[in-house]
Design a protein with these regions (language model features):
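Amphipathic alpha-helical repeat scaffolds of TPR domains
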Residues: 157, 174, 204-218
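Alpha-helical solenoid scaffolds that mediate protein-protein interactions
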Residues: 198, 215, 235-239
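N-proximal helix/coil linker or "cap" segments that precede and/or mark the start of modular domains
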Residues: 227-255
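Helix-turn-helix repeat elements of alpha-solenoid scaffolds
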Residues: 183-192, 222-229
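A non-transmembrane, solvent-exposed segment enriched in polar/low-complexity residues
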Residues: 16-183
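Sec-dependent N-terminal signal peptides
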Residues: 3-12
């Protein structure tokens, strides 16, 4: 009896000391056996391969070997042509998200998954990823600015159609073009303001580091030194050692 008690107690102690790592259980209806799934950390350049596996019965599993100090911004890539040696001829699907030290579920129809490459229609909404609180926060941000983002895209496409494309043939619809640009700038300002407010409220999250880097890159020289300093000094000390913080600082220094 004492031996049994010791074995059970030892097992419980070992379980308690197991590192908390990410685990992704994936379901890709329509995927063929042999498709390769890879998970990359894209916090910084170059990307770092975290894990890889092969799809079997439309399912896959990825699991970490050590605990993330901070949630990682990742890209999950599905290689539908693993035997193709020419990278230019490969068919790749990809999805970017934040991974926590948690059990996550990834679901998407294979033919509806976003492409690794640019495509005119954003398909990220076809993916369901649950179990990552950090990704939930990022999704909450995207939902909060969805209307502004869609309006910004629509205005840019209208500008290309009304002014840019005709200008290539020597037709300059200047008045119409300037009207669109003024409205586009107003929408961009509102979007930047909403992003800035989100960063202030969530200044302890790596999500805000990603958004800050995007904000700095999109505004370029439009931000004043005081605004940049205010942005950089607004993060909690807990984020100072995050790899994404290094990228944000480099971007700010180039402004």
């Amino acid at each position: 009896m004492k031996l049994l008690y010791f074995i059970v107690l030892t097992g419980l102690c070992m379980a308690c000391h197991q590192p908390r790592v990410y685990r992704i259980n994936g379901s890709l209806p329509g995927a063929l056996d042999g498709y390769v799934v890879k998970l990359y950390n894209i916090d910084t350049y170059p990307d770092v391969l975290l894990d890889s596996t092969v799809i079997k019965d439309e399912k896959f599993q990825l699991e970490g070997t050590r605990t993330f100090e901070y949630p990682k911004y990742c890209r999950l890539v599905v290689d539908m042509t693993p035997d193709e040696p020419d990278q230019r001829k490969k068919t790749l699907k990809a999805y970017r998200f934040f991974a926590d030290n948690t059990a996550m579920e990834f679901q998407c129809q294979m033919d509806s998954m976003p492409s690794y490459y640019w495509e005119p229609v954003n398909k990220e909404h076809n993916v369901t990823l649950t179990g990552s609180p950090t990704q939930d926060l990022y999704q909450a941000y995207k939902t909060s600015v969805q209307e502004l983002s869609e309006r910004k895209t629509a205005l840019w496409n209208e500008y290309l159609k009304v002014y840019h494309v005709p200008a290539l043939d020597g037709i300059f619809n200047t008045e119409k073009g300037m009207k669109i640009v003024r409205e586009l700038n107003r929408v961009k300002a509102r979007l930047n303001e909403a992003t800035g407010e989100f960063i202030k409220v969530h200044n302890n999250s790596v999500v805000s580091l990603l958004l800050a880097n995007n904000l700095l890159n999109s505004t370029r020289s439009e931000m004043t030194v005081e605004e940049i300093d205010g942005l950089m000094n607004g993060f909690t000390p807990a984020l100072q050692n995050a790899s994404m913080m290094g990228d944000v600082k480099k971007t700010a220094e180039r402004m």
